[in-house]
Amino acid sequence: MARELRALLLWGRGLQSALRAPALAGVRRGKPVLHLQKTTVHFRDPTQSLASGISAGQLYSTQAAEDKKEEALHSIISNTEAVQGSVSKHEFQAETKKLLDIVARSLYSEKEVFIRELISNASDALEKLRHKRVCEGQVLPEMEIHLQTDAEKGTITIQDTGIGMTKEELVSNLGTIARSGSKAFLEALQHQAETSSRIIGQFGVGFYSAFMVADKVEVYSRPAAPESPGYQWLSDGSGVFEIAEASGVRPGTKIIIHLKSDCKDFANESRVQDVVTKYSNFVSFPLYLNGRRINTLQAIWMMDPKDISEFQHEEFYRYIAQAYDKPRFILHYKTDAPLNIRSIFYVPEMKPSMFDVSRELGSSVALYSRKVLIQTKATDILPKWLRFVRGVVDSEDIPLNLSRELLQESALIRKLRDVLQQRLIKFFIDQSKKDAEKYAKFFEDYGLFMREGIVTTAEQDIKEDIAKLLRYESSALPAGQLTSLSDYASRMQAGTRNIYYLCAPNRHLAEHSPYYEAMKQKQTEVLFCYEQFDELTLLHLREFDKKKLISVETDIVVDHYKEEKFEDTSPAGERLSEKETEELMAWMRNALGSRVTNVKVTFRLDTHPAMVTVLEMGAARHFLRMQQLAKTQEERAQLLQPTLEINPRHTLIKKLNQLREREPELAQLLVDQIYENAMIAAGLVDDPRAMVGRLNDLLVKALERH
């Protein structure tokens, strides 16, 4: 068993379709069968099943292992129908052969969806009958859908025990492509819309998808009312159909599809079972293929969250995500306002790979309408930054074009996307409050997606909502403890308008940065941002809760423009005099040339000899990183226009002042190195190897004195 599971795990990594992942979808001869696309894996020991339970109502239920006998076949499909009386011919009203060709060849991208459409219509008919019988207080008959394949005859048959159709209904429902039987039925029951809203969409359109694969379509239908006659509807899709009374017709509807020569694969049982497993596993009614029950999965997103076990969640997650880990977070979200939504979302336990982060694919969430699959990966219902989320969304309000495959990009879809995004953000915020340590690990693994969301989203209010999920270390908190922007804002002193941050590779470099040192005099809390894209993220965010996000590097430049004064309280003998400082700055401007725009004095620094200031340094730094070709020092200087600010109290600056006249060659080496050190501290030098030669010269000069 262990060896088989390991082999299965390795094979499963190559799966492509999210909804063709491991799912116990059927049983044969007492052994669970694991369907993986078109491959089946049989376990040698029937007692070693991946799921337990024997009732169809249980998730991933299998036949009891103890039952050694093969389950008896159950089918209602038989050739009892016979045409009697005259045949009447009708032309499609306003639906010509050309229009039929459009529906059959252009509307659907995959021919296999005709099975999904016909199953949906059968479910529709059963739902109508159930509603009618319940309202009338009558006993419900067997509510079933049956499919039968016949490879010799090249046919596939689908039959339901639903409400059936009269002769007039056959003409109106199947004679007009654009007519919706379900819609008309709902209009007649508007006062009971809540009960009737479960009916699955447009019957007429779905029915005509059969002509993608059919040379001829036979329909036998009989209303559920006693003594009602049955009828045959027959057409080859050429623009004309025939109707005749028929005997031997069971209540409900039976459709026989005579397949085209290039579509004979749909007369193969395994091919049909693959399609049903892909699209219709969650239909509410029992679904049989050649006498065997094939839809054994339960739509757990429609259940009460209290009734779903942890095991069921794990198995369902593995099914929809083609995964082998467990979900770290589970959100079961149900609402009827402002939209009808039944959904389950999972966040994988496994850390995303670089492929997961960089891939251009959209959502990994499947979209259903009343438990019928619409899209395996619905790219429009979640924003791209949430592509790490796995799950299912089921909504009766989703607008569909004639084909269920072509979702309209409408205001309703955008509303659904906004509602789901806000609910997921709220869920993550709640999780951060519930278990901060678990959330911190989640943010470490998935924080890059949130940063992407802020950078790629245009609306400021949505940016700020996503920003509530960001976490950073802070100068006001111990190392390792994270804080949010909301928590930072709550600690701000009255009248403070800015949230300050500093980007550095780690806390040690942040705390020893000349820019953080310059902020200490203000006694202001500073967020420490360590990730590569934090700076770009905060530049795009700009503000949070009406407070500006300011890099401490930018704040220093702004202070200079505002000509804020910082008093130097050190004794006169410990610093250069004002005259010496002015002369030194003039010499440094000349020595550094075009590499600097200006040289100034600063009293913000204590342990650092100098620092570089650039207006909008974060944006400039990001721009330099994005350049394909390395730039020379002169080109960088022209772009950055840096100002070098010197600390007149520092030993290096005082020694430089002494050396500039006594040993000009050594002084030049020293001022070049002070400048380069400041550029490195500012993160404006990607490759420091160019300065190695100068450092060697400085070491030689230092050793020559001994």
From Swiss-Prot:
Name recorded for this polypeptide: Heat shock protein 75 kDa, mitochondrial
Domain of life: Eukaryota
Phosphothreonine PTM positions: T176, T496
Family of this protein: Belongs to the heat shock protein 90 family.
Subcellular compartments: Mitochondrion; Mitochondrion inner membrane; Mitochondrion matrix
GO molecular function: ATP binding; ATP hydrolysis activity; ATP-dependent protein folding chaperone; protein kinase binding; RNA binding; unfolded protein binding
Species of provenance: Rattus norvegicus (Rat)
The keyword Chaperone appears for this protein: yes
Binding residues for ATP: N121, D160, N173, F207, R404
SUPFAM superfamilies: ATPase domain of HSP90 chaperone/DNA topoisomerase II/histidine kinase, HSP90 C-terminal domain, Ribosomal protein S5 domain 2-like
